[in-house]
Amino acid sequence: MSETHLSTKKFADFPLHKEVQQALNEVGFEFCTPIQALSLPILLAKKDIAGQAQTGTGKTLAFLVATFNHLLTEAAPTERKINQPRAIIMAPTRELAIQIAKDANLLAKHTGLKVGIVYGGEGYEAQRKVLDKGIDILIGTTGRIIDYVRQGVIDVSAIQAVVLDEADRMFDLGFIKDIRFLFRRMPDAKSRLNMLFSATLSMKVQELAYDHMNEPEKVEIAPNEKTSKNIKEEIFYPSMEEKMPLLLSLLEEDWPEKAIVFSNTKHSCEKVWSWLEGDGHRVGLLTGDVPQKKRLRILEQFTSGDIDVLVATDVAARGLHIADVSHVYNYDLPDDCEDYVHRIGRTGRAGQKGVSVSFACEEYALNLPAIESYIQHSIPVTSYDSEALLDDIPAPKRIHRKPSSHSRNSRDRSGSRPQGGHRGNAPRRHDKTRRHS
């Protein structure tokens, strides 16, 4: 975590339970991020908050520290049953729930509190067996939580702490009825510690907060900056014919450590994947059609570095929290302005630098004015030399509806990246620059 992303406030400055502080010390967290420094004094005073913060600001640790501290300093309800968790953390996607659970388990090490995670798509019986043993903190997606509530596997009537993460995405994905269903089955808002976090505190999000929370205090981090200053943005105006050669050429020139390429449709993503795979890149594909087990495997490979480039639609990428993404490429400009912010927010996180490259082609260039109006600044335009684009691009690989998770056809060339790189051991083809300032 970069020091430019941290405040001068230390976790040790707060009256945290000794086991929470011990866990923080062991994982190396000493200084708070701004959202942690602002929210923890409120939460430790047992007051509710509605926090506005982008992903990568440290909000997850803020609400986890508050949740663990609350459960360790408050007595459990008398006659609490084994199927009654004490805290519930709701997330819009499986991937976000999984990441929250990983972070929660780091804090749970010395506390004796049990963490359980539930999400749709797989593992129904396995997840149920964990719940049957009893848990203190339930983390999951609303649909699967409701399934277990309706079956009596989970009873939320003893909840002492509630977290709603990425509330704006909950609205986008149509989960608000599910959330209200769960809130109505919990104890009164005044008897719980309630936390809501959202990238934007729109009127609908604030209405949800005031309906189901106890006079929450609003906490905002850089509300006027929709895009991070740590992200270098640029935009190209390629023709439809030069769009793919430009992408492949920029990947060759930028040689990003970890990149995500966004496209607007499943078909377009498959096309991009085919060209990158044919060119020998170690590339994964995430669309709504990818089965959950394969999706998790691809994400694990991307996180571990076995895949360098991930091609994804907006829906498939929602909730992704992957560290160290150096570049984001908008192969298509999104139709939704907020999607642009969410896309490029995958890079430049936790104080790191990132690069966002967008293509304004003939089909999607009309989306640009609305995007620039929404982010309140113009995206710098970069020109390129058509003659410098790669001209030895292999044919795309046929997808056969079962794309491999990474390249298996890397060409045998000695390379500048030992044990991998975008084309296995393949080096860059040449050092010609394609950008013109």
UniProtKB/Swiss-Prot annotation:
Domain Helicase C-terminal: 243-390
InterPro entries: DEAD/DEAH_box_helicase_dom, DEAD_box_RNA_helicase, Helicase_ATP-bd, Helicase_C-like, P-loop_NTPase, RNA-helicase_DEAD-box_CS, RNA_helicase_ATP-dep_RhlB, RNA_helicase_DEAD_Q_motif
Catalysed reactions, as listed in the record: ATP + H2O = ADP + phosphate + H(+)
Compartment(s) where it occurs, according to its Swiss-Prot or TrEMBL record: Cytoplasm
Record's compositionally biased regions (Basic residues): 425-437
Ranges for region Disordered: 394-437
Keyword RNA-binding tagged: yes
SUPFAM superfamilies: P-loop containing nucleoside triphosphate hydrolases
GO cellular component: cytosol
Domain Helicase ATP-binding as annotated: residue spans: 40-219
Keyword Cytoplasm belongs to the record: yes
Residues where ATP binds: 53-60
Enzyme class: hydrolase
Motif (Q motif): 9-37
GO MF entry, a single one: RNA helicase activity
Top-level taxon: Bacteria
Record key words, sorted: ATP-binding, Cytoplasm, Helicase, Hydrolase, Nucleotide-binding, RNA-binding
EC number: 3.6.4.13
Entry-linked SMART domains: DEXDc, HELICc
Biological process per Gene Ontology, one example term: RNA catabolic process
Family named by the database record: Belongs to the DEAD box helicase family. RhlB subfamily.
Quaternary data: Component of the RNA degradosome, which is a multiprotein complex involved in RNA processing and mRNA degradation.
Function: DEAD-box RNA helicase involved in RNA degradation. Has RNA-dependent ATPase activity and unwinds double-stranded RNA.
Name listed for the protein in its UniProt record: ATP-dependent RNA helicase RhlB
